[in-house]
Regions:
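Short, aromatic-enriched amphipathic alpha-helices that serve as compact interaction elements
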Residues: 46-62, 72, 76
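Low-complexity, polar-biased intrinsically disordered regions enriched in Pro/Ser/Thr/Gly
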Residues: 60-66, 147-148
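Boundary at the C-terminal end of the N-terminal hydrophobic targeting segment
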Residues: 34-38
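Bacterial N-terminal signal peptides that target proteins for export
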Residues: 4-21
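TPR-adjacent "capping" and linker segments in tetratricopeptide-repeat scaffold/adaptor proteins
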Residues: 41-43
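Bacterial N-terminal signal peptides
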Residues: 20-30
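Exposed beta-sheet edge and beta->alpha loop/turn motif
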Residues: 113-169
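Short solvent-exposed beta->alpha transition segments
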Residues: 64-120
Length: 169
């Protein structure tokens, strides 16, 4: 009788363990899929490409997940910039504020390099927001020179307040 009871308990426990195992496998794969979408800084990415990565992500902010564009933008923010604008939840709040919300889900952008030196590049960025209004920004990226995994990567150090440019036709 005791052996039958133990056998019954084991058969009852095994499906629960199996379900937990399946849930864990699902979470591992779905989490790695989300992080695979985030591009990481590396020395091969040029200054203009940093801005393109950030703007492309902000253009589709909630794809593949909520605030993915803001998170992608955060990954290419210079550590000094992150200290001022972070942590990430504060950065999300800042981007969603009136000052920068036009970057979220914008329709298009143009990037024009206006200054370049050995370690700093400055661009004029014009975006057409989802309400078909134009805004201009000064966007600055710098090469990170400190030893570590970001060494020689171009990262955003500053984005100006937007300058309204009017509506499209």
């Amino acid at each position: 009788m005791k052996k039958e009871l133990n056998s019954w308990k084991m058969s009852k426990i095994q499906p629960d363990i199996y379900k937990i195992f399946l849930v864990l496998i699902f979470l591992i794969f779905s989490t790695s899929e989300l992080t695979a979408e985030i591009k990481k800084p590396n020395p091969d990415i040029k200054p203009r490409e940093v801005i393109e990565i950030q703007l492309d992500a902000l253009m589709k902010n909630d794809i593949p997940s909520k605030d993915n564009g803001i998170i992608q933008t955060w990954f290419f923010a210079h550590p000094n910039n992150q200290r001022v604008t972070g942590p990430i939840e504060r950065f999300k709040y800042m981007i969603k504020s009136d000052s920068y919300s036009m970057l979220l889900n914008h329709k298009s952008y143009e990037i024009l390099e206006v200054y370049k030196s050995k370690g700093i590049s400055t661009f004029e960025v014009t975006i057409l927001d989802k309400d078909k209004k134009y805004y201009k920004f000064k966007w600055q990226v710098e090469k990170y020179e400190v030893d570590g995994f970001l060494k020689n990567c171009w990262l955003t150090t500053a984005v100006s307040q937007p300058m309204p440019m009017g509506s499209s036709i």
